[in-house]
Amino acid sequence: MYKKLYLIGILLLGLISGLTFNLIFFTVPYQLSEAKYTTDIIGAISLAAFPYCLKVIWSPFIDKYSIPFLGVKLGHRRSWALVSQIFLILAMMWFLKRSPCNNLCITAIILFIIAFFSSTQDIVLDAYRIERTTSKEELSIVFTFSSIGFRLGMLLGSVGSLYSSIIFGWNTVYKFALFITMVGPIVILCIKEPKLKTKRHTTNTLIDLQQYFEVIKKSIISFKNEQQYLLLIILFVFLYKAADSIPMAMSIPLFLDLSFTTHEIAVIYKAYGLLIMIVGGTLGGILAAKIGIFHSVLIGGVIQLLSPLMFMILATIGYDIKTFIITITIQNFCSGFAGTIISIYFASLCNSEFVATQYAISASFSSLSRIILASLGGICAKHLTWSVFFLCNTLFSMLFIPIFYTIYRKKLHFMNHSKKI
């Protein structure tokens, strides 16, 4: 019975993460689009999500520092989860008192604070899920429930927010998001602290924490030693993400500009699109297991080029439901397919001694690429027609192919040289 309640708790915590994530990346940008703000401003607002990219910086601090009193009463992970969620709720209360459209500077600051505590919560919950499991099978189940919860949170934050905004208004949408977030502390108090085989070495003072930050330094050095072409990989990831991040960031301004209704966007783009994304992600994982990571990455990248291409076709044709459905199908399938494969590729780059930190570094850079590309895309979209913008997006994204081919050649050369030695 407890196991079932524990999994429900994991699902609810995942839902809260997905809801707050979607608040920054979809709900507020959509409201600003409705208020006729330009694409460069909407793109700039996405910079408020920077904490999602930089969470690797303070994750060692969360791992090492024990919160006085709460750390003893609740345990290390639960105390951090509770504190991060309380501050997240306070930030959302502050956000609720203001209209996002009235003062964009204040809106960006509040969203940045929300992103900080939401990403802090994610750090803690990721560690909790890993430490709480005792086998690979249980780990798979726990992360599956967490993923389902995250997607449900995104669905509530998109389809739910759109319909609620029509019926009740945007203020009620944010009240609803706050109400769901307030469930988080209750869930944390109901679940148990992980039982570790070895004693955790933590401190409740700031002395000696500098030593722990050596983990990040060693991880980066190890990363560089393992991958002599690290700069090429960084450039590759940036270009690889361009075919997905830019269309995703500019999708709502485009759809509204083409006169698609809120109902059509909610049902086709968010609800139907989410299901297609799950299908694409599943098939991407299967392909990587069947034919290997390198070939899968290439296939995923090429398929992903169809996404901005379809947006260009939609922008050229204009309002057309059939073309809209085809575009959403291709865009979400490609996003799920390539997203899963690039995550597997990140994992393959990690040294076994520093898997957690190195994967966090890779994930942070991936998030950073998405935010930078979204911001640059917003600036470019203001000065180009939609058709020309997405054509340039397609051509720019194609540059990943020669970069990836160079990485592949260097990898083969390194492997052959190692065998000779």
UniProtKB/Swiss-Prot annotation:
Belongs to the major facilitator superfamily. Its main location: membrane. Keywords: Cell inner membrane, Cell membrane, Membrane, Transmembrane, Transmembrane helix, Transport. It is a multi-pass membrane protein. GO terms for cellular component: plasma membrane. The lineage of its organism: Bacteria, Pseudomonadati, Pseudomonadota, Alphaproteobacteria, Rickettsiales. GO terms for molecular function: transmembrane transporter activity. It is found in: Cell inner membrane. SUPFAM superfamilies: MFS general substrate transporter. The chain crosses the membrane at residues 6-26, 41-61, 80-100, 104-124, 139-159, 166-186, 230-250, 274-294, 297-317, 324-344, 360-380, 388-408. This is Putative transporter AmpG 3. InterPro entries: AmpG_permease/AT-1 (IPR004752), MFS (IPR011701), MFS_dom (IPR020846), MFS_trans_sf (IPR036259). It comes from the Bacteria.
